[in-house]
């Protein structure tokens, strides 16, 4: 990827040596830490990111500078999906034609996907009202997008507050509602590779699946075809709401989503505590043999790590090699690593996603 803002814009913290060399160095650091040789899944080198946030300064998009305080104004971003790339300049021109839209506009967020749908969030340091809504509605129609306006204590939605993403996984298309402000995988091309890697493992497994940290069902729905039943849990209310909508959109009937933290799942499975949220679910009816976890950067807490060790098969997706290494030191006391992979979700940064499959 060639970008005139390399070395200035802080969104890409690695910019020397080219993409292949950067990825090679990240993989080498992973291999040194784990002593394992992973399967490598690279990213597209440009136009790969499905969400982006930009400050808005004097009618221009801006990002934080790389090695110093302050902002650098930009007219384009090579990282973002083609749909966002094409939208950025058109949106800026229309915003700047309407003072009511540009006045004290603090930030502009973009959310898009392989489906081509786009949602823009405009965040203000002033109240927004009906006059703002009228102007925003005009540009939403002109650009065929949805818009969410936000100011302190107020939200105005023009159209929908989500996009419907279409992910082709093993030649089957899955639909996902990605809501404004909620977590979604940032790189859909690498996300598909992650799901398919997990799917190649799951197709040879037996029994039922327990998934912790399921989010809006990104892995749940494609993996559900390989199991008799799936119980998927997540603590975030909006993610569970989206997950239930997504399972209905796809006509999948062997998945139950429940709002529980990983600690609460541990308590429920061990009979330590009863939960009203589980009153319509018979935990004893499940034949759990596989657990799938995709925890936050902090990794697994002690109780969840002990619970995970009780399963025959563990599929672990990690966004932090350091906490994955800590967790594997414990999991490896009862399980053996069968497969390991790295996924370059975040090109031009030090970050590296990884996946590990362990069996007892």
Swiss-Prot record:
SUPFAM superfamilies: S-adenosyl-L-methionine-dependent methyltransferases. GO terms for molecular function: rRNA binding; tRNA (uracil(54)-C5)-methyltransferase activity, S-adenosyl methionine-dependent; tRNA binding. The keyword Transferase applies. S-adenosyl-L-methionine binds at residues 185, 213, 218, 234, 294. It catalyses: uridine(54) in tRNA + S-adenosyl-L-methionine = 5-methyluridine(54) in tRNA + S-adenosyl-L-homocysteine + H(+); uridine(341) in tmRNA + S-adenosyl-L-methionine = 5-methyluridine(341) in tmRNA + S-adenosyl-L-homocysteine + H(+). InterPro entries: MeTrfase_TrmA_AS, MeTrfase_TrmA_CS, SAM-dependent_MTases_sf, TrmA_MeTrfase, U5_MeTrfase_fam. GO terms for biological process: methylation; RNA modification; tRNA processing. Its EC number is 2.1.1.-, 2.1.1.35. The active site is at residues 319, 353. Keywords: Methyltransferase, S-adenosyl-L-methionine, Transferase, tRNA processing. Belongs to the class I-like SAM-binding methyltransferase superfamily. RNA M5U methyltransferase family. TrmA subfamily. HAMAP family: RNA_methyltr_TrmA. Dual-specificity methyltransferase that catalyzes the formation of 5-methyluridine at position 54 (m5U54) in all tRNAs, and that of position 341 (m5U341) in tmRNA (transfer-mRNA). This is tRNA/tmRNA (uracil-C(5))-methyltransferase. It comes from Nitratiruptor sp. (strain SB155-2). The lineage of its organism: Bacteria, Pseudomonadati, Campylobacterota, Epsilonproteobacteria, Nautiliales. The gene is trmA.
